[in-house]
Amino acid sequence: MATELGRLGVWAWLDAYTAPEAAAFAKRLEDWGYGALWIPEAVGRDPFSLIGYLAAHTESLVFATGIANIYARDAMTLKAVHKTLSEIAPGRFVLGLGVSHEHLVTQVRGHDYKKPLSTMRAHLEAMEAALYMGKEPESD
């Protein structure tokens, strides 16, 4: 089932807000008719924890990572995150992944930055193959 993002969405870096302020912001977007809130990942809050919190404070707004860094979590963890948020907020979560930027991966995170396309492909294949023993969400 495809997630409906709506006609208008907002990309917002919310790390300057407290969690309750971010929830109020998300609720305002929802009330104003926005379809989606895209949340990036850099060196601040964990976007997935924040999305879980925001989803609990909204009813219809779709949340998407824009983007989450594949170097921050292994494939099994990302699969579990995707399944968990898809269960918590059915039809309201989009997992946007990326390879980030070389300096963030090598200098900030301490990983080797390899060929982006083949690295992403391998990560997605590993996610697909990863073990997940939790209850499957109704929409994924």
Task: Annotate each predicted stretch with a short phrase.
Residues 38, 62-66, 86, 94-96:
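Short, conserved beta-strand segments within well-ordered enzyme catalytic domains
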Residues 19, 37, 68, 110-113:
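Active-site oxyanion-binding pockets that recognize sulfate/phosphate
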Residues 17, 72-76, 115:
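Residue-level signal for the nucleotide or nucleotide-sugar donor/cofactor binding architecture
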Residues 13-15, 42, 68-70, 98-102:
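Active-site beta-loop-alpha junctions enriched in small/polar residues
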Residues 48-68, 72, 119-129:
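Alpha-helix-loop-beta-strand connector modules within alpha/beta enzyme cores
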Residues 1-63:
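N-terminal beta1-alpha1-beta2 module of alpha/beta enzyme domains
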